[in-house]
């Protein structure tokens, strides 16, 4: 069990496996294979979901717009890993009405076509090539997680108040969601869990090393002695 607020286990085996990677690469996949991989998230009425699966069809689709100060811009491009960008392609029959496409399921967040705005998450393409979607499809390891939404690429003076307009499309029931503004460096964003994990493992290894040193000093092993 997980005490309130309810946690979102994006790495649950049934959830993370509910997808078809060949379909996400833009390949044609037969319906029986899609049903095997995506279960009840394969069809919407008599139309095939493209993409299918629980991960794609639970996309976080809140919209954040930086409205103040006017001198700052929220850049939503280049937020996905370069390796991930290469794994998502729209198929040759993109737009076929026998399928229900991502831009129909999430019209506020996902456009159909590529954007000409270099700061847009759809600068590389619409549909499954939208970077917000690609970021979401990389499963988080922990039940409390963050997903990169955009970047402010200018220094912000201390004391500056940021005002965001939020369109809350993603329904939550006894869960928490938040907009976090943080500073990143070449190692990534602030992550207390990862830091304490490294400290814990380091202390554990240090204690073991001390124990082995004490053992070697008090009861040394003779070279070639089979008793040890």
Which residues make up each language-model segment?
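Membrane-proximal loop-to-helix boundary features in eukaryotic membrane proteins
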Residues: 8-12, 16-17, 21-30, 118-119, ...
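Extracellular-facing/secreted segment signature in eukaryotic proteins
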Residues: 24-155
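Short, small-residue-biased leader/transition segments that mark boundaries at the very start
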Residues: 2-4
């Amino acid at each position: 069990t997980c005490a309130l607020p309810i946690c979102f286990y994006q790495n649950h085996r049934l959830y993370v496996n509910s997808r078809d990677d060949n379909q996400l690469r833009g390949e044609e996949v037969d319906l029986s294979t899609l049903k095997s991989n995506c279960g009840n998230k394969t069809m919407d009425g008599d139309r095939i979901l493209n993409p299918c699966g629980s991960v794609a069809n639970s996309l976080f689709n809140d919209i954040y717009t930086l409205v103040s100060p006017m001198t700052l811009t929220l850049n939503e491009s280049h937020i996905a890993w370069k390796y991930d960008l290469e794994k998502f392609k729209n198929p040759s029959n993109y737009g076929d009405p026998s399928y229900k496409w991502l831009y129909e399921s999430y019209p506020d967040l996902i456009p159909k076509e590529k954007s000409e705005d270099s700061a847009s998450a759809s600068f590389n393409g619409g549909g499954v090539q939208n970077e917000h979607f690609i970021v979401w499809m990389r499963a988080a390891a922990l039940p409390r997680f963050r997903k990169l939404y955009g970047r402010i690429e200018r220094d912000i003076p201390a004391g500056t108040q940021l005002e965001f307009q939020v369109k809350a499309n993603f329904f939550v029931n006894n869960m928490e969601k938040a907009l976090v503004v943080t500073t990143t460096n070449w190692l990534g964003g602030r992550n207390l869990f990862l830091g304490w994990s490294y400290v814990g493992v380091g202390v554990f290894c240090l204690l073991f090393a001390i124990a082995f040193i004490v053992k070697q000093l008090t009861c040394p092993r003779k070279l070639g002695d089979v008793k040890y």
